[in-house]
Amino acid sequence: MKYAVAYYTRSGNTKKVAENIGEVLGVEARDISLELPEKVDYLFLGSSLYVFKYDESVEKFIEKNAGNIGTIVSFSTSASGNSTAKFVKECAEKNGIKFYPHSFKCPGSFMLFNPGRPNEKDLNAARDFAKNIKSQLGD
């Protein structure tokens, strides 16, 4: 299996989660400002909600790299506790990309909300999420 990890972040919360997932998968987590250099079977894509909205650059990244992505696995951080999975799934399907049925989300710190998150417990959960998917895929 060929994996990649890409993320969009403003605060650094999603980057922390992405780096931990990348560690499990043996790949470097990359900001979505960078194109995917090659085709991947599974792209773990991290994004965030800002004032209950996703950033449009995530959608543009998916469109631009659609030919290099087999399946997207979504993960997200948010001060509100909500997930970006529904949005990412819609973007994936619109571009003919499969969407993995399970996603990961954890709280992210923002101003007075969720200070210190994601914490070590959250990052361990992210690593376990990636390990479980690898195991399910027989990798």
Where are these regions (language model features)?
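FMN-binding flavodoxin-like domain, especially the glycine-rich phosphate-binding loop
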Residues: 3, 9, 13-28, 39-139
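Short, polar loop motifs at secondary-structure junctions
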Residues: 32-35
